[in-house]
Swiss-Prot record:
InterPro entries: MFS_trans_sf (IPR036259), PucC (IPR026036), PucC-rel (IPR004896). Residues 57-62, 130-142, 203-209, 282-302, 356-358, 416-436 are periplasmic. The chain crosses the membrane at residues 37-56, 63-83, 110-129, 143-163, 183-202, 210-228, 262-281, 303-319, 339-355, 359-376, 395-415, 437-456. The lineage of its organism: Bacteria, Pseudomonadati, Pseudomonadota, Alphaproteobacteria, Rhodobacterales. It is a multi-pass membrane protein. Belongs to the PucC family. This is Protein PucC. The keyword Iron-sulfur does not apply. It is found in: Cell membrane. Residues 1-36, 84-109, 164-182, 229-261, 320-338, 377-394, 457-461 are cytoplasmic. Its main location: membrane. It comes from Rhodobacter capsulatus (Rhodopseudomonas capsulata). PucC is required for high-level transcription of the puc operon.
Amino acid sequence: MGYRAFALKNLARHAPKYLPFADVASEEVPLSRLLRLSLFQITVGMTLTLLAGTLNRVMIVELAVPASLVSVMLAMPMLFAPFRTLIGFKSDTHKSALGLRRAPWIWKGTIYQFGGFAIMPFALLVLSGFGESVDAPRWIGMSAAALAFLLVGAGVHIVQTAGLALATDLVAEEDQPKVVGLMYVMLLFGMVISALVYGALLADYTPGRLIQVIQGTALASVVLNMAAMWKQEAVSRDRARQMETAEHPTFKEAFGLLMGRPGMLALLTVIALGTFGFGMADVLLEPYGGQALHLTVGETTKLTALFALGTLAGFGTASRVLGNGARPMRWSAGCTDRVPGFVAIIMSSLISQDGIWLFLAGTFAVGLGIGLFGHATLTATMRTAPADRIGLALGAWGAVQATAAGLGVALAGVVRDGLVALPGTFGSGVVGPYNTVFAIEALILIVAIAFAVPLLKRGGR
């Protein structure tokens, strides 16, 4: 027990110096409790890395699944993103015999995650025609894989929306943006750590190892999410009785009130445009580095770490200035950092010397802008929403962000491939289509800034 107390004391003393947003901890809600709660973001990071990174490559290369079919499967989780607003509202108004609001929804999402991961490896092997499944009807593998990805996506959206709402319930209103920022920092950590673990486990790929890794992720998701929500919400019979008698508006009424708040529609439009531009960049940076700058697979993989470092720097900067009273909409113009970033990325393929360094600088700048933009718009959304509808506001923010990012990822590949297919437009070079897409992204971000200007003039929070 003495060692545990010593470790917790040193964690509370030193973490604020090195971990962004760690200063949100207090005597009532110590950092150890917040970090334990953030384990749900670790499982979300594991899932995102497994789907978008590891399985993306395994399905195309090792399992020889057509790339178009892989894209459809990876887009399945996006179908559930618009429902995050409803999830947030349901967790705000949930009625429980134990007086719990968020924990039941986190558990529901965990079950969805587990179910999807449990059937996913076998569905993918059937989809690829592995072994005796080569004679199975094609629709069986496609249907099972689609169901697996849809279940996992639904689980991730439910867990993240309810988990973030629970995090905001634990702290004072002025600290809510900071605690959500801390949760997103842990999401980035989860993505980086899980990428290293998955890479090591699947270094020598076999179908059996694929089954072990995916089902191990299913088990880890259950264990970590249970640890995250354990004793975070206090059981209260009195609160349960209040829940039974409390009158709540319908979802339509609550959503209408939220959208009727001054500036909310314009704010969500800015979020959609800015995140859409980010989504288009996310899917093309690594192939651009390989084809335009001739970077190796190992070198392009490190772009993820550089990108995450820039995002962390943006989150940390936004946390510091917003904590000192700065207006979030002014800092949401952090997407202006991404416009020069895209210019640097485009120029990196057009100069003969030091192009790689310019590309790396542009990648970091894009990550920095994303961190500033994401935290500032999240803070603005929470400040605009009513105090008793934080879950609904977080759901709306998450729904817009996830949907816009998914559409950006899908459209970037389509536009790039369409430009490549145009005869004689770019000659035999591979750089032109990429640079055109990056230029489109920069224009979209400029439009986002234009939509943010009226919010700045209004002088809102």
